From Swiss-Prot:
Catalyzes the isomerization between 2-isopropylmalate and 3-isopropylmalate, via the formation of 2-isopropylmaleate. This is 3-isopropylmalate dehydratase small subunit. Belongs to the LeuD family. LeuD type 1 subfamily. InterPro entries: 3-IsopropMal_deHydase_ssu, Aconitase/3IPM_dehydase_swvl, AconitaseA/IPMdHydase_ssu_swvl, IPMI_Swivel, LeuD. It is an enzyme of class 4 (lyase). CDD domains: IPMI_Swivel (cd01577). One of its GO terms (cellular component) is 3-isopropylmalate dehydratase complex. Keywords: Amino-acid biosynthesis, Branched-chain amino acid biosynthesis, Leucine biosynthesis, Lyase. Its EC number is 4.2.1.33.
Amino acid sequence: MQKFTLHKGLVAPMDRENVDTDAIIPKQFLKSIKKTGFGPNLFDEWRYLDKGEPGVPESQRKPNPDFVLNQPRYQGASILLARKNFGCGSSREHAPWALDQYGFRAIIAPSFADIFFNNCFKNGLLPIVLPEATVDQLFNEAAAFPGYQLTVDLERQVVVRPQGEEIPFDVVPFRKYCLLNGFDDIGLTLRHADKIRAFEAARLASKPWLSHTMAA
């Protein structure tokens, strides 16, 4: 998993409340669990005028010119500014996969759905909860200033505005540790690989019949 320490990026404002995971990545694209190839279908039903199907190249689709991510000023955005209850709906992990593969590193919103919130951390995305009034201010600034960028400093737990003002945010220490070091669940487990192997060897030595049971 990619580490997250400090990131400065262009902000794209998604001015909708209750954006659910089916809007983030529609159900017809959930047939794969390879964790790759979901970026082109992020927000598919809003991003394109035609209905998307697996295997149809992005070049053959009809972009919706009114959708925020299709507007030239937001091309290359890596910080998503969202409204409350972002990521509600089903628990599909494909949603953070699609956001990550599109190029987003952080999402700022007044609130997130719990399962989506946790899935973000497990996939290298940083979800940041800020007061609704602060998010409103950021929306106004993003709309008023083309090329609007924010800096997210995870180590110091601040979002830095272009003029230098710092906005603090909270993050669970364990989640922060994992992002700073690029550890997903598998990475955390592999840090203890030697202990796991030693435990398995000792267990089989004391209970050799288990090896026959496992082989059977």
